[in-house]
Regions:
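Sequence-level preference for short, compositionally simple segments enriched
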Residues: 1-183
Length: 183
């Protein structure tokens, strides 16, 4: 009932390197799509109408064959949402990778700096949240994150404030690869 039929369409019309803040309001619903916020988009806030009822979901996993080669796609192409831009905020939204437990399946893949996630849910199994770039900073506030095997991983500096982190299996929660020179 909004101006766009998908979250990806709303992101696509944003201007590159905006100096002002752009807010994308997402109505309640389930959006089955892969969303990429490219590196040239900055100062965007994506706000869901209701955290539990505004869901972006997809079901890729590491063993899905690529159409071009037939080879497995691997971990880093499995994302549901990939954020390459800087100064991006997500609020009141669920990001889910609902692939069966057939290998790595990333819900959130981050590459941008100064990313903020407020009152969001991140759902998956293995590798739910990938903090993907060295020397980038992420802030998670009042979020819920669940998974099975090392489901928060990567080299970014990530701060978790008042978050619930739930392991769905008896396994490791994190697999940080923060460089040794970062304290």
């Amino acid at each position: 009932t909004g101006q766009f039929r998908s979250v990806g369409e709303a992101v696509e019309v944003c201007r590159a390197f905006m100096e002002y803040r752009k807010v994308i309001f997402v109505k309640k619903g389930v959006y089955k799509e892969k969303v990429v916020v490219p590196s040239w988009l900055t100062n965007i806030e994506i706000v869901g109408e209701d955290r539990d009822k505004t869901v972006i979901t997809y079901d890729d996993h590491a063993n899905v064959p690529l159409k071009e080669t037939g080879l497995p796609m691997g971990t880093f192409r499995t994302y549901t949402v990939k954020i390459e831009g800087c100064d991006i905020t997500l609020r009141n939204i669920t990001i889910e990778n609902n692939a069966e437990r057939l290998g790595q399946a990333v819900a959130l893949h981050t590459e941008g700096d100064r990313l903020t996630f407020v009152n969001c849910r991140f759902l998956g199994n293995q590798d739910t949240v990938y903090t993907g770039m060295q020397n980038t900073r992420l802030c998670f506030e009042d979020c819920y994150i669940e998974g099975t095997t090392d489901f928060i991983f990567g080299p970014s500096t990530a701060w978790f404030e008042n978050c619930e982190i739930r392991s769905k299996a008896d396994s490791y929660v994190t697999a940080a690869s923060t460089p040794a020179d970062i304290q």
